[in-house]
Design a protein with these regions (language model features):
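A conserved FAD-binding loop/helix module that cradles the flavin
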Residues: 556-563, 583-586, 590, 660-683
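Rossmann-like NAD(P)H-binding beta-loop-alpha module
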Residues: 409-422, 535-569
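Glycine-rich FAD pyrophosphate-binding loop
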Residues: 425-441, 569-581
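Flavin-dependent oxidoreductase catalytic cores
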Residues: 1-407, 411, 415-422, 426-427, ...
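Internal hydrophobic alpha-helix adjacent to the cofactor/substrate pocket in enzyme cavities
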Residues: 345, 350-351, 416, 562-574, ...
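A Rossmann-like FAD-binding core segment of flavoenzymes
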Residues: 453-501, 509-518, 523-546, 565-649, ...
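Surface-exposed acidic, glycine/proline-enriched linker/cap segments
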Residues: 187-190, 275-290, 389-398, 456, ...
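Residue-level detector of alpha-helix initiation sites
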Residues: 410-412, 435, 497-498, 554-556, ...
């Protein structure tokens, strides 16, 4: 939490919020700044972050989402943003970038451009459209475009810029030999020629704005898993060149390329936990920390670069305050760059400074924010319903203190209790199980711990409602008579959904384990062992045969399949709907998990009809043809159904009765938290 400098800019501490698009713009804004975005950044500044980097729209001449800085007309809006950030004593930077070969991928834009035009069969990212190679006059125009954008940012009152030369964006296509096949002055012949465009941009920014206008250069420290990708030795050389050009700090993260064995389906990400999911790769890239499922994975890269430069080095990627502190104290880096943890809790820096680590709302690494952003949709957070709604969701004291009963100790119930207690209500929470968490411990067991950390959410919510004085009643089922005795003003039912058991011949057979029965058994074991230990024990023994058919190919079925594959089962997924994977995040998570399942030999069948279950297995029909899938065990993993029985029985008991979460409409954790946060602000 000590202050430091980037160039002449003094930071409050060593935590930087990097420049990631939040997409709070609307069509009516036409690229101009709006109050929603300003409110979010002001809240982040108020939360104590050392330096805030605001996002801008890509520097292309097109109707793209985001807040633009390509013309002078956008300066006044950015001036308001800079003032809001400065209001709470935080320096303000803005990121500038050009999407390059990614241009037409997620929004309407001109065809992509890059250092070279590479056929799809040879491309590092074959599902990108083939990009057009930039001629030298256009390269010089782009250098000027970056320089003018930085000039506008300075006029708006910002203290510096973050130059994004990483990921798969335009500038990285020059730095990387995998993308750059040119033979001219900007070609692949030397580090200097590959870095030439970035060097010229930094020099132009300094020429236009003076040497005191700070520049952070963001680069890929390595392109892990990519043939001819950037190596640490190369990024060390790039860092030296960019420092010589005038960069005031070097920001480092890894780009992870996830290749299948046949090398035909390549994807990449700068989210390291995806590289470790559903299981770590057999061969790990050099200089990557693999000890924490992706947390701190890029620290060794940044540490290597720090040895080669005299300017501060920033590490980006999945990080925690504890690992960040260790990396800074050991001299491996000077700053940590966070995004998702700060979206999950804007007050993270203030809480770290106060020693209140247990009060930090944890990022569970669900990647919901990234998935929304990749679709150019407003970014929201699984655990922080106030993200993007900072002004509307500011906690306000209740006009009248009420006695509030919350039924259910899952995420919806605990979030409701937390917010209601913050507003001054007297809150009583009832959970029929002996522990809080609802279905989250079971979800943690099945999901595993390679990517998501849902257990941290349980710990956080439990800690908060305990500190706020919520009266927690475990092992008590709510009945009409209990409510009549308590006489609350408000009842909020968050009791979870019910398991759907299909009406099918043979469903009661000995080989069948319905989701209801599976949950009941696992919950019993969870009481004694906990999710982490039980996760290990199930790798030794499970009450399931070798061949398993999963009825239901949505998110629960796919995650269950991965869970069973890791435990040596041969799995078949059958789904009545149009596709496998409904409910999984469309970007990264779904394609990566489905490819992994396919590579592991999982058979996935959609558009089927369940016919019957016999001792041999499950009989289905598909396209008019019947077949029996032989199985030793059949597991149902169908979507939950609403559970309205308690709601119906209590409607006439108290003035206000609400149903939220899965008992109203089964969805995901983000929906449960959002439901609880919303309803608790209205009572």
């Amino acid at each position: 939490m000590e202050p430091a400098y980037i160039g002449k800019v003094s930071t409050r501490n060593r935590i930087i919020k990097n420049g990631t698009g939040l997409f709070y713009d609307t069509k009516a804004d036409r690229g101009h700044m709006n109050d929603t975005n300003i409110a979010c950044y002001e809240a982040l500044s108020k939360g104590g972050v050392g330096l805030l980097v605001a996002a801008t729209a890509p520097l292309i001449d097109a109707d793209v989402p985001g807040f633009r800085i390509t013309r002078d007309e956008y300066i006044p809006g950015f001036s308001k943003l800079a003032a809001a950030i400065h209001k709470h004593g935080c320096p303000a930077f803005a990121q500038i970038f050009h999407v390059g070969p990614m241009s037409p991928l997620f929004f309407k834009a001109p065809s992509g451009v890059a250092a070279s035009s590479i056929p799809k069969s040879e491309s590092p990212r074959p599902f990108f459209e083939v990009a057009r190679a930039l001629p030298i006059p256009e390269i010089q125009d782009i250098v000027e475009t970056f320089g003018k954008a930085a000039e506008r940012i300075k006029k708006a009152g910002f203290d510096g810029i973050e130059l994004n030369s990483a990921t798969n964006h335009l500038l990285n296509s020059f730095l990387s030999r995998a993308w750059n096949r040119r033979q001219d002055a900007y070609g692949c012949g030397s580090l200097e020629s590959r870095a030439k465009i970035v060097i010229e941009i930094i020099q132009d920014i300094k020429r236009r704005n003076g040497r005191d206008f700070a520049v952070i250069a963001l680069i890929n420290g390595a392109e892990v898993g990519l043939k001819q990708g950037i190596t640490l030795e190369e990024s060390k050389g790039f860092a030296r060149l960019l420092e010589e050009a005038g960069a005031d700090a070097i920001e480092v993260r890894a780009e992870f390329y996830m290749n299948t064995e046949d090398d035909k389906r390549r994807d990449s990400t700068h989210f390291p936990e995806i590289y470790f999911y559903p299981e770590p790769p057999k061969v790990m890239g050099a200089n990557i920390d693999r000890n924490h499922h992706g947390v701190g994975a890029s620290v060794p890269l940044a540490a290597g670069i720090k040895k080669m430069v005299s300017v501060p080095v920033i590490v980006a990627g999945r990080l925690t305050p504890e690992l960040g502190e260790k990396a800074i104290r050991s001299g491996m880096v000077d700053f940590i760059s966070l995004n998702r943890p700060l979206l999950a809790d804007h007050e993270l820096p203030n809480k770290v400074a106060a020693g209140r680590l247990e009060d930090i709302r944890p990022c569970t690494s669900c990647l919901t924010c990234f998935d929304l952003g990749e679709h150019a949709q407003p970014v929201h957070c699984q655990v922080n319903a106030a993200l993007g709604r900072e002004r509307e969701y500011a906690i306000k004291a209740a006009k009248r203190k009420k006695r509030v009963v919350v039924v259910g100790g899952g995420p919806a119930g605990m979030e409701t209790a937390r917010v209601a207690a913050l507003r001054g209500h007297e809150v009583m929470l009832y959970e029929k199980e002996p522990k809080l968490g609802g279905s989250l411990p079971l979800a943690a067991l099945v999901k595993g711990f390679e990517r998501e950390d849902v257990l941290s959410l349980i710990r956080y919510l439990k800690t908060q409602i305990t500190k706020l004085g919520v009266k927690i009643n475990l092992g008590r089922e709510v009945t009409r008579s209990l409510i009549e005795e308590i006489k609350p003003d408000v009842i909020i039912i968050a009791a979870g959904g019910t398991h759907d058991v299909p009406k099918l011949s043979g469903i009661d057979g000995r080989t069948v384990l319905t989701s209801r029965d599976l949950h009941r058994k696992l919950k019993t074991y969870l009481k004694f062992f906990g999710p982490r230990l039980l996760n290990r024990l199930t790798k030794i023994w499970m009450p399931l045969g070798k061949r398993v058919v999963i009825m239901g190919g949505g998110i629960h079925g796919c995650q269950t399949a991965a869970f069973l594959v890791k435990r040596g089962r041969k799995v078949t997924i059958v789904e009545t709907g149009k596709e496998i994977g409904d409910g999984l995040l469309e970007v990264l998570v779904k394609p990566h998990l489905l490819m992994w399942l396919a590579d592991k030999g999982v058979t996935m069948m959609a558009k089927v009809k369940y016919e019957k279950i016999t001792d041999k297995g499950l009989t289905i029909s598909q396209k008019g043809k019947k077949q029996t899938i032989e199985a030793d065990s059949i597991v149902t993993a169908l979507p939950l159904k609403p559970n309205t029985e308690l709601l119906k029985s209590l409607k006439d008991v108290v003035p206000e009765v609400y149903a939220i979460g899965d008992c109203k409409e089964p969805h995901l954790i983000i929906d449960a938290i959002a439901d609880g946060a919303r309803i608790a602000r209205t009572i």
